Amino acid sequence: MLNPNLLRNHIEFVFKNLARRGFSLDVKQFTEMEKKRKILQTKVEELQSRHNTLSKHIGRIKLIHPNIQCMKERIITLKKKIDVMKKELKILLEQIHIFLMNIPNLPDINIPDGMGSDDNQEVSRWGIIKNYNFKIKNHVELGNHLNGFDWKSAANISGSRFFIMKGKIALLYRVLGQFMLDLHTNEHGYLETYVPCLVKTNNLYGTGQLPRFKTDLFYAKSLLDESQNNNNFALIPTAEVPLTNLFRDCILDEQQLPIMLVAKTPCFRSEALSYGRDTQGLIRTHQFDKVEIVQIVHPSDSMQKLEELTIHAERVLKLLKLPYRKTLLCTRDIGFSSSKTYDLEVWFPSQNVYREVSSCSNMLDFQARRIKARFHCNAQNKKIFIHTINGSGLAVGRTLAAILENYQQKDGRIKIPKILRNNYMNGLEFLE
């Protein structure tokens, strides 16, 4: 959520910056609500002051006017007016809150303007793209050849966009996630955290998935409590949700920053906005595993910490020796809560394209304001909002798909990345 005072005092600045990302701020609506809020708050304060004065001095007035019934009636009337206006003000404040919750974050001044992914700025490339002297296969064909996928059973059990893995491919999938966790905890200093996959929906408002992206979520209802709303719980689309909400309503000590957390969880997405795209394989599924890295940082450090976190995600790809490129997302391609985002895109030879395997974003204080997460700043001697940074480190399914394609052999075998062979795959060199 944006700072409400920024809208109150610099609404034209906010309007122009939001326009960069294609969002049209309704200045008239906000101005009218703010005008009404000021009037109501002033009236409530005036009436409350009169009520307090009369109540405070009623004993003294009683000595002057033995019959004080009229005074008591005035106090009762004032109290009723105050209650009515407070109720009206509460409704208005809720409307303003909903208005603010639907406004995306301001894009960083240094990211490129653009209309979509074609306008993203390539920052760097790493790795050597192989030349194959045979007809290459995609990851679905390769996995099927090794009897590692069971798409039919997955569809029978759960429907489309689900997968079942078996044997050595299932093993590789499992150890990939373990390798990522080990790297981030042992070398990068993150604290491994186990979190729920089912969360109350207020947590999704906190990180910014709600209210705008409600159709991209899977919801759950408890049949044990009929009073609960149908959408009271949801399956997490990313571990960013529970990890960030760990700091809801917290006031941290400045010395605690930065806080670095990592979690591997199943993630669930309806992919409602991706109908007809990547309907086969591991690229776009309703359920997938992802290792998420999150940092809770001091505002003065957040941009530098974004660079650091992105390097941590890149390290996974480098150790696996997977060719990738790093792109800086343009204004209309960044996520709702993000101010600046880097995408890491791994090479898929069967498609002759790079595909996203990680997004690393700086949310500034956007999420912190929504969850009321602050720290005590020693220099300013006051409580200010933290900054939140997060990224995929990495999406396990897409990483597996990239390994299958980039490490495929002419005879259909898959060479296992060297970093995984002895420590994770019991010395196995090939999937065959």
UniProtKB/Swiss-Prot annotation:
Pathway note: Aminoacyl-tRNA biosynthesis; selenocysteinyl-tRNA(Sec) biosynthesis; L-seryl-tRNA(Sec) from L-serine and tRNA(Sec): step 1/1
A GO cellular component annotation in the UniProt record: cytoplasm
Q: Does the keyword Secreted apply?
A: no
GO biological process terms, alphabetically, are: selenocysteine biosynthetic process; seryl-tRNA aminoacylation
EC nos = 6.1.1.11
Under InterPro entries, the record lists: aa-tRNA-synt_IIb, aa-tRNA-synth_II, aa-tRNA-synth_II/BPL/LPL, Ser-tRNA-ligase_type_1, Ser-tRNA-synth_1_N, SerRS_1_N_sf, SerRS_core, tRNA-bd_arm
| Annotated residues for binding of ATP | 269-271, 356-359
- Work out whether the entry's keyword set contains Lipoprotein: no
Q: Which reaction does it catalyse?
A: tRNA(Ser) + L-serine + ATP = L-seryl-tRNA(Ser) + AMP + diphosphate + H(+); tRNA(Sec) + L-serine + ATP = L-seryl-tRNA(Sec) + AMP + diphosphate + H(+)
Q: Which SUPFAM superfamilies match?
A: Class II aaRS and biotin synthetases, tRNA-binding arm
Which CDD domains does the UniProt entry name for this protein? SerRS_core
Pfam families reported in the protein's UniProt record: Seryl_tRNA_N, tRNA-synt_2b
According to its UniProt record, where is this protein mainly located? cytoplasm
Its subcellular locations are: Cytoplasm
List, in alphabetical order, the Gene Ontology terms for molecular function in this entry: ATP binding; serine-tRNA ligase activity
Q: Which family does it belong to?
A: Belongs to the class-II aminoacyl-tRNA synthetase family. Type-1 seryl-tRNA synthetase subfamily.
Assembly, in brief, is: Homodimer. The tRNA molecule binds across the dimer.
Stated role: Catalyzes the attachment of serine to tRNA(Ser). Is also able to aminoacylate tRNA(Sec) with serine, to form the misacylated tRNA L-seryl-tRNA(Sec), which will be further converted into selenocysteinyl-tRNA(Sec).
Q: What is known of its domains?
A: Consists of two distinct domains, a catalytic core and a N-terminal extension that is involved in tRNA binding.
- Name the record gives this protein: Serine--tRNA ligase
- Name the source organism: Buchnera aphidicola subsp. Baizongia pistaciae (strain Bp)
